[in-house]
Amino acid sequence: MRLSALNDIADGGFAEVEASIGDDAESLILYRDGDDVRAWLNVCPHAGRRLDWAPGQFLKSKDGHLVCAAHGASFELDRGDCVAGPCRGDALRAVQVQVRDGEVWLA
């Protein structure tokens, strides 16, 4: 399933997309790092809420972490591990994606 064009995601930035995973429609966070893209479910492990403060609008700390808009949990962007806040030691649920020919696809 095609999720996005790579160029539609700013380098070092985020995008929110909807995808079918199994039988469920899920909101995903896409994070672009050069020609790589990492993806996670748009759900904070602390309280099960979306991480964006408005649809598709994500907070990034000075340290380069994704910050949950609800309770301030901070997630590093390599594996999605929570490094600060109420769910420290937990992690975002990763979703496998791949970049092919300038497009981001669900793997």
Where are these regions (language model features)?
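Axial heme c-ligation environment in periplasmic c-type cytochrome domains
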Residues: 85-87
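Short cysteine clusters
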Residues: 44, 68-71
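N-terminal pre-ligand scaffold of iron-sulfur
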Residues: 1-62, 76-77, 91-107
